[in-house]
Every structure is written in C-alpha cells, then in structure tokens.
Amino acid sequence: GGHMNAAGVHCVTFLLMAKECGVEVDEHTLQSSLLQFYRFAGRGNVAYGDGLPEGGMVDNGRTTGLAFAMQAAANLHPDGEQSVYAKARDISATKGFYSTSWLFHGHTGGGIGELWRGQSMGLVQDKRPDAYHSFMDGRRWMYELARTHEGIFGWVSTWNVSYTETATERRGWGNRIPLIYTLPRKQLRMFGAPP
C-alpha cells in the first residue's frame, strides 16, 4: 500500500468538515490523518506519495489543498484564527500561491495548478492584499477568457486543458475557475465564513 497525498489531503478536509457538522467521525482516523498532513506545512510541497515534503516550486495544487485542510482544522480548534492550524493555512496558501509565476506550468498542462493558485491567494487576501490584487490584475485577462459564451468555464488553450476538456466533456473541473472570484467573499465555511 501507499499514499496518494494529492487526493488524500482532500479526504482530511472532508473528515474535518464532517466533524464540524456533527457527523460521527472516527477520532483515530481523523487525528492520524491530520497529523500526516500537518507535518507538511512550512516544509515544502506536499509529497505525492509516502515520503518527505518535496522541494521545488511547482506543486500542482497539493499545497493549496493542504491550506484548505488547515482552514477546516482551524475552524474546529478553540483558538480558531490564533491556532497553529490557521498559521499552517497561511503558510501553505502563500507557498501554493507563489509556487510558480509560469502560466499553465505543471503536468496536465498546468490547468490544475492554475485552479489552485488563485484559490490559495483568496485564502490570504486579507493578510496580503497587495499580492492578491497584483495577482488578480495580472491574471484577469485569463479569467475573462475562461468564461465561454455558454456560461461555462474552461481554460483557453491548445494544450490538454482547453474548453472541450475542462468545461463540458471528460473533466468538469474547469467549473472551479469561478471560485477564484467567489472565495474571497467568504460565503462558505471552508473559505472563512463564520459558523
């Protein structure tokens, strides 16, 4: 057996959010998986597999996924925004945001990394407003082109992240693009809305 942390980090987020909603969650599973991922915060990129944190810049969304898990953990912790999990969220979101300045860089043509990069900045926009606005101003053209005439979203590209791939056909993840705009409004609990 092995770990696939790129997917597993979202399972931790789910467990934490389920617990906050009152669902009975196995405490050992929750605590051991939270420990597994918390150890990556501030130490590089979340590893793809069962290993140490990875070096390098491009993380393809893994470290931002960790930031969302840490947001969910901070929501449960009595210290909330003063907790170690809130600090881990900010560190991970900043790392995810600054993971690369290259547009569409990474495997899958970079489309996945671009989805997470904007969302990571949305998590720390209050603490890094200048960086957030610089990012949004610099990428606005790309987000505007991502909206199709049908009202769906997908990256405009001849790579493997084009409209037909991300918006309607085999992959629907292009529809996550609007979260880059809506996340900073903090209307969902995972994005910082009050309970």
Regions found by a protein language model. Name each.
Residues 1-115, 122-134:
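Extended ligand-binding clefts on enzyme/binding-domain cores
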Residues 76-78, 83-94, 120-195:
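Terminal, non-catalytic domain-edge segments
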